[in-house]
From Swiss-Prot:
Subunit structure: The complex is composed of two ATP-binding proteins (SsuB), two transmembrane proteins (SsuC) and a solute-binding protein (SsuA).
A GO CC annotation given for this chain: plasma membrane
Membrane topology, as annotated: Peripheral membrane protein
Catalysed transformations (reactions): ATP + H2O + aliphatic sulfonate-[sulfonate-binding protein]Side 1 = ADP + phosphate + aliphatic sulfonateSide 2 + [sulfonate-binding protein]Side 1
Pfam families: ABC_tran
Organism field: Pseudomonas aeruginosa (strain ATCC 15692 / DSM 22644 / CIP 104116 / JCM 14847 / LMG 12228 / 1C / PRS 101 / PAO1)
Subcellular location: Cell inner membrane
PANTHER family: ALIPHATIC SULFONATES IMPORT ATP-BINDING PROTEIN SSUB 2, TAURINE IMPORT ATP-BINDING PROTEIN-RELATED
MF terms (GO), sorted A to Z: ATP binding; ATP hydrolysis activity
Top-level taxon of the source organism: Bacteria
Keyword Iron-sulfur applies: no
Protein name: Aliphatic sulfonates import ATP-binding protein SsuB 2
Function per UniProt: Part of the ABC transporter complex SsuABC involved in aliphatic sulfonates import. Responsible for energy coupling to the transport system.
Length: 249
């Protein structure tokens, strides 16, 4: 493996309970990979390991040196990894703009914050407090915060599961735009079949306890995509059959 981010033979246990066993994946530049599977199969644990938020595991995480570039690196990108969680986790005493720029010294780059907010559909909302946002708006702010450091890789842990179906579709379309406009690689954790195949170039189906990758699906469709595409319906059916065969539904 030689991608931007490589996970090699990852194993993880909580005491005597093994939660991950021999998981390997690679994320290439500009690629979107979905980790699809039921609750409890280790998807979120694997993402935390990839993000560097959990170092109590066996195996290897290899990050391409480009992820360590400073602010003056190629194309003005700082490199590194951005993370978006299931809940927005906005600090309630800060404005939306302050939340987005908080990680880099309290709005050192206000113009960049304004651009990010515009790109995620929150133009003019920078002065609002989190309590004034809807759930979908708060998650848009969280995505902007994840992009603030100009990362090469964005990791998302079920980022749209807490919003209604219509808001979820709008946020999925927003993520497609982000991938194209920012030329970013994405690792997405989801339990939603439609979401996994609509957004990803590759879908890694996880299951079992301890969790492992059961099957890999390639999605050979250009973006933007049509949710009604026959190819997507076929791939969803294949994944559903595999999940039923593995008794994970």
């Amino acid at each position: 493996m030689s991608g931007l981010l490589d996970l090699l033979e990852i194993r993880k246990a909580y005491g005597d309970t093994r939660v991950l066993e021999g998981v390997a994946l690679s994320l290439a530049p500009g690629e979107v990979v979905s980790l699809l599977g039921p609750s409890g199969c280790g998807k979120s644990t694997l993402l935390r390991i990839a993000a560097g938020l959990d170092d109590d595991f066996q195996g290897t995480v290899e990050r391409n040196p480009i992820l360590g570039f400073g602010p003056d690196g190629e194309n003005g990108r700082s490199g590194g990894i951005g993370v978006v969680f299931q809940e927005p986790r906005l600090l309630p005493w800060l404005t939306v703009a302050q939340n987005v720029g908080f990680a880099d010294g309290w709005l050192e780059d206000e113009h960049w914050v304004e651009r990010l907010l515009a790109d995620v559909g929150l133009a003019g909302c920078g002065g609002l407090l989190p309590k004034q946002l809807s759930g979908g708006m708060a998650q848009r702010a969280a995505i902007a915060r994840g992009l603030y450091g100009r990362p090469q890789v964005l990791l998302l842990d079920e980022p749209f599961s807490a919003v209604d179906a219509f808001t979820r579709m709008r946020l999925q379309d927003l993520l497609q735009d982000v991938v194209q406009n920012y030329e970013i690689s994405v690792l997405l954790v989801t339990h939603d079949l439609d979401e996994a195949f609509y957004l990803a170039d590759r879908v890694l189906l996880m299951g079992g306890r301890p969790g492992h990758i059961r099957r890999e699906f390639h999605v050979p469709l250009a973006r933007p995509r049509d949710r009604r595409a026959v190819e997507l319906a076929y791939l969803r059916g294949e994944a559903l059959t595999e999940m039923q065969r593995a008794h994970v539904l």
